[in-house]
Amino acid sequence: MINITRVEYCRFSLKGRLRLLDLFGELVFEKITPNREMGVFKLNDFYVAVIKDLEMNSVIEASPLWTVDQLQFYFSQ
């Protein structure tokens, strides 16, 4: 396990963020729609939302969730 904070995680490039999730993240939620794939990962004591555009086959975002409301939003989609 890696000891990293949300702020430290934000300093990494998108490629670095995804690598950290590959190595140390735990997938807790995943949803696939016709155009997008959304995943929520747990990394240490915070969650990270990853959004992938399936048409372009590229990751759009890998950002930490700062509030419980954001986490609930992803689970309710």
Describe the residue ranges of each PLM region.
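Polybasic/polar functional segments that serve as interface/processing modules
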Residues: 1-77
